[in-house]
Amino acid sequence: DRKSLPAPDLSLRQVGEEYVAPTTQIEQELCAIWSEVLRIEKIGIHDNFFRIGGDSIISIQIVAKARQKNIFFAVKDIFNSPTIGGLSLVAKTQEDLLTLKPEQGLVSGDIPLTPIQHWFFEQQLKNPHHYNQATLLQARHQIDASLLSQAFDLLVSHHDVLRCRYHQESSGTWIQTNLSQEDLSSLWTVFDLSSVSDQDLASHIEHQATLLHQSLDIEKGPLLKVALFSCGTRPSRLLIVIHHLAVDGVSWRILFEDFEGVYQSLKEGKVPSLPKKTHAFQQWGHSLLQYAQSKEIKNQLPYWQNIEDSLNSLPTDFDKGPCTGEDVHTLAVSLTQEETTSLLQTVPKAYRTQINDILLTALTLAIGDWTQNYTLSLDLEGHGREEDIIPDMDLSRTIGWFTSVFPVHLSLENPEDLGESIKTIKETLRQIPHKGVGYGILKYLSQDKPLSSSSLN
């Protein structure tokens, strides 16, 4: 919840870096985009993106919004030039001719599974149909059910992966297919809860939400369900449920932005339009298969084999076999505003780190204090949209499950020295090639499958 976070303290600008206003048109456009996405009113052309609240996922939003203003650059350009002044020098105001053109029409046909989708089917879940992500929105104004239905019809037509199906062949292999059209009537439900009391409203919504979650079917479809809860004079609720095979955290941001724009246009009586498509999930899948056989990815193999050889497990009291869903418990911890400010702003400035560096240092120290062994092996997740591995690929407005999962081995030789520990963890994480996306490609897409299928506890 970004609204509950402290506003970035722009007094943390580096010494000697005063506020410098944008002067050129491209600088002004970029400042406006950064202000909107980061929710900061005043941004100068020398403010560092990552020190005022930016991160790798937000950078994808920046790229997408800039494209709508006909300003073109890649996520890697933000990392290489993290100020508006620097970025304006590498950005282009017209799109280069791409070797691989984004498909603007309906996409259909088989799609190679991405590494994270291979991982999903490898789990052999008892109920693979119920592995969903969802969001429940409370409307500020009454929602027009007819316009809402039209909006989602358009979104499902535009974002192709929402029309996917999966089937398992006799060999055990799962096949992913993009349908050219969807039975839109099966996506949409309206519940009239106007007569339900305030006391019972939440339980009624929860019950229907559970049924909607259980109704998804990756083989028969659909992968998406939308429900409008009409609550009389009380604010309506909108529930969107999508199977994880078709969506990730970045995808939700794209979907919300498109839904808001389309619904508002329909409400105003205008013909809705969506931004041009970026490369399809299908194009990404085929490109990853080709990349998996390349010399570049095979050069990463010694690194990942060394990581696998270094992995160690946490000590356990009992050997109960594989962990199941019923073994999972959640522990919630909250930080004060002062602690949050230190974590997000003060410490990163002092050590030139990102939040992952600090959190993983703290975790390694905590586990080490418990086990008296200051080494830790764990899996990390990334957004997986490392499009720089594929020339001319743009995924900034593509919906799908792109997440990367990869093992990391952390080791502290001098845990008493906090500064040295932070530096050690930081350097270990910086050595990971292409932010870890190569591990899954080698493990699942390479023809000779050179990496093991061992998992961490």
Where does each model-flagged region fall?
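His-Asp-centered acyl/peptidyl-transfer active-site segments
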Residues: L106-G109, Q124-N132, D160-C164, L184, ...
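Structured, non-catalytic alpha/beta "coupling" segments that mediate domain-domain communication
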Residues: D1-P6, V161-R163, Y303
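Flexible, P/S/T/G-rich "lid" or insertion loops adjacent to the active sites of thioester-utilizing
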Residues: S35, R39, Q117, F121-N132, ...
